[in-house]
């Protein structure tokens, strides 16, 4: 369900809305779901719809970029824009344009390798650039460190549930992973459509394919399969909207 300024948005309320055709299915799905989305204004709602579609597009762009998967300790990037911290974070160099540095990852992917959690943050930034434009992005995010979302300035939250939406970040957990290959303890993914996910390092796959891949990296004698957690990680759109408007 969608609540705008304390008022429930009903299906009949949007019948005459003039919005991009590709936003309609997502809008209707959000209205009909039991998951509650709260906004201060219609502008915030439209911002979320566009941002989610751009997250999907950004995930597909990163998939095609040639950027590779690497553990945090083996992270690397284009040294024109980024330095790598001892922890494996990509830190934006002083006076480098943030939007140009982020776009470089998509345009020159073979110069980059990073963890799947880092990939999610990069996807969020790529989507934001396409949603708000380079000038607003550069003004709002002048100091960027790409690591994971627990280290991030972006307002991000995770909540439990079984209802997922385009652009959600989900997690496939591998509880009996091989300790020698700990990077396969799980996989962060972006939901691209019904049973279609982008998983950095694996590609665009369905849920069974991701689970089969993770199961191939279990410890010897493992009995428990990898599985999709009942939770979603999302951008806090009302908070983000106040940052970038």
Swiss-Prot record:
The protein's Enzyme Commission number: 2.3.2.13
Catalytic activity: L-glutaminyl-[protein] + L-lysyl-[protein] = [protein]-L-lysyl-N(6)-5-L-glutamyl-[protein] + NH4(+)
SS bond partners: none
GO biological process: sporulation resulting in formation of a cellular spore
Alphabetized HAMAP family for the sequence: Tgl (MF_00727)
Function: Probably plays a role in the assembly of the spore coat proteins by catalyzing epsilon-(gamma-glutamyl)lysine cross-links. In wild-type spores at 37 degrees Celsius, tgl mediates the cross-linking of GerQ in higher molecular mass forms, probably in cooperation with YabG.
Protein name in UniProt: Protein-glutamine gamma-glutamyltransferase
Annotated source species: Bacillus subtilis (strain 168)
Lineage of the species this protein comes from: Bacteria, Bacillati, Bacillota, Bacilli, Bacillales
């Amino acid at each position: 369900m969608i609540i705008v300024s304390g008022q429930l948005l009903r299906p009949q309320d949007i019948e005459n809305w003039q919005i991009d055709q590709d936003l309609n299915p997502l809008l209707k799905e959000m209205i009909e779901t039991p998951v509650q989305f709260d906004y201060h204004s219609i502008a915030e709602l439209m911002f979320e719809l566009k941002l989610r579609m751009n997250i999907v597009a950004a995930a597909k762009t990163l998939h095609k970029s040639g950027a590779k998967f690497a553990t945090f300790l083996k992270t690397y990037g284009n040294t024109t824009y980024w330095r790598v911290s001892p922890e494996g974070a990509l830190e934006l160099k002083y006076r480098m344009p943030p939007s140009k540095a982020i776009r470089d990852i998509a345009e020159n992917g073979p110069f980059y390798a990073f963890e799947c959690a880092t990939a999610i943050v990069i996807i969020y930034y790529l989507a934001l650039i396409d949603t708000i434009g380079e000038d607003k992005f550069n003004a709002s995010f002048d100091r960027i460190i790409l690591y994971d979302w627990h280290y991030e300035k972006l307002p991000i939250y995770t909540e439990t549930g079984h209802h997922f939406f385009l652009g959600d970040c989900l997690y496939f957990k591998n509880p009996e992973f091989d300790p020698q290959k700990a990077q396969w303890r799980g996989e962060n993914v972006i939901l691209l459509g019904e049973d279609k996910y982008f998983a950095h390092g694996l590609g665009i796959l369905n849920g069974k394919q991701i689970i089969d891949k993770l199961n191939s990296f279990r410890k010897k004698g493992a009995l428990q399969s990898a599985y999709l957690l009942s939770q979603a990680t999302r951008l806090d759109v009302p908070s983000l909207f106040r940052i970038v408007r």
